[in-house]
Design a protein with these regions (language model features):
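Flexible, low-complexity junctional segments that flank or bridge functional domains
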Residues: 1-236, 240-271, 279-283, 359, ...
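Conserved acidic, small-residue-rich alpha-beta core segments centered on
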Residues: 94, 248-416
Length: 438
């Protein structure tokens, strides 16, 4: 059923991981123990839309587990405390060396192997492990209640040991919401602002999901680019950092304002079969209309009903100035498709870190959510392989690489500094100054 199960790793490689998990089932095991075995095996598929989820009862009880009271950042393979919710509240900025006697390198390796992500892209997995670090310590390693943590001071390099008492996850979420509202995920689709006497337009796109009742995404984009035209901006900075995707068509529509000739966005959408046999385990049965499908010679099917298929037209008013795009490992799915097309058409300069989605497309679209009958562990299985239209030569298992790599420090995060944005602003100002001189 999975649309691209062997897209990045061979059958032998994936089978080996599932065989290892099966071999470990040589004794009685509870649902959480089974989840710990299954999750790395599923992650070996290397698909960012494919994952094992906790049973619903364990997921609900997780809110009351006593977990490590830190928010962390993974930076170049090292783990730093970003927010400290422990009793002393004085450890932010420290580097974690070990937890309960386990070296942090081993912890990160174990958690990363269990994290879903496209291909061989480390930036996305680093972000996802960092976001869910405290939860993963429990669900994958069983660490809870009491934590013996060894820390390194980044400046003095001295080591200190701390006995940290776990706190309920629910309380930690509430503390984060109250103390650090700036850390919370934004639900905005788009925000437009201007700098340098309106010579620089800044388009912040947090996701491709429109929640406004009185406007659709197409209208919002059109009005935004009309405003950019009316203010005669010379440089456009587009920020899709931590944009995990949304509506496919909005990514294509955004790209259509950056180009002035017809273009192809998707080459093909394919599925393995027109009939699925796992309905008894699925939350909702999958039913694809026959008129949407066209049989292929290899036994698969082309999916025909999608607005991003076929020749696409540019949108007006097209922006013809310089484009700078801020990216990171959280730029995924719909935003990754947009980034591939911009990159393949040489339409922008990229700043930040490698994007989170594989260059030639992902496996997503229609999904099956399966619940395993004995453990109630759930599996998310995407059915559709997306093939982006591009002749650009690129590693299939990697994302878009930045022209200007920027690596943040833990102090950047704590102090709220944004070096990617500052660099983009500097480049935009330099570009505008050169234009004026000419």
């Amino acid at each position: 059923a999975h649309g691209g199960i062997y897209r990045y790793n061979s059958k032998a490689y994936i089978d080996r991981h599932f065989d290892e998990a099966k071999a470990a089932l040589n004794h009685d095991i509870d649902a959480l123990g089974f989840y710990r075995l299954l999750k790395p095996a599923v992650a070996s598929i290397a698909c960012g839309h494919t994952t094992a989820l906790l049973p619903l009862d364990i997921k609900a009880s997780l809110d009351h587990e006593l977990l490590l009271p830190f928010d962390v950042k993974l930076l170049q393979g090292r783990v730093f405390i970003f927010r400290d919710f422990s009793e002393g509240n004085r450890l932010a900025g420290q580097e974690i060396v070990s937890i309960n006697g386990m070296e942090i390198r081993s912890i990160v390796q174990t958690l990363s192997k269990a994290m879903h992500g496209d291909g061989n892209i480390p930036s996305m997995r680093a972000i996802e492990v960092g976001r869910a670090f405290k939860e993963l310590l429990f669900t994958m390693l069983g660490m809870r209640q009491q934590f013996k943590v060894v820390l390194r001071n980044p400046k003095s390099k001295s080591l200190t040991q701390h006995q940290i008492v776990g706190q309920e996850l629910h309380s930690l979420k509430q503390a984060s919401l109250k103390q650090y509202p700036q850390d919370q995920d934004s639900t905005n689709f788009l925000k437009l602002s201007f700098f340098d006497d309106a010579k620089i337009a800044y388009l912040k796109i947090d996701n491709f999901i429109v929640k406004e009742e009185n406007k659709d995404g197409a209208t919002i984009l059109k009005e935004s680019f009309e405003t950019i035209r009316d203010k005669n901006a010379a440089t456009l900075i587009i920020d899709v950092r931590d944009n995990g995707g949304g509506e496919d068509a909005l990514g294509k529509l955004l790209f259509s304002y950056l180009i002035d000739t017809p273009f192809s966005y998707y080459d093909a959408l394919t599925i393995k079969t027109d009939h699925y046999t796992m309905d008894q385990y699925a939350e909702e049965p999958i039913r694809l209309k026959a008129k949407w499908l066209s049989a292929r010679s290899d036994g698969q099917f082309d999916f025909l009903k999608h607005p991003n298929l076929g020749i696409q037209q540019p949108s007006l008013p097209a922006f013809k100035g310089r484009v700078l795009i801020l990216i990171n490992g959280g730029s995924y799915s719909t935003s990754s498709e947009f980034l591939t097309q911009v990159h393949a058409h040489h339409r922008a300069t990229f700043i930040g870190e490698e994007s989170g989605g594989a260059y030639y497309g992902n496996t997503s679209g229609h999904h099956m959510l399966l619940t395993l009958p004995n453990t109630k562990v759930r599996l998310v299985v995407p059915l559709m392989t997306y093939q982006l239209s591009t002749k650009q030569s690129h590693a299939a298992d990697r994302g878009v690489m930045p022209d200007y790599p920027v690596q943040r420090t833990i102090e950047d995060y704590i102090q709220g500094r944004d070096p990617e944005w500052r660099l983009a602003l500097k480049l935009a100002h330099q570009s505008n100054t050169k234009t004026l001189k000419h």
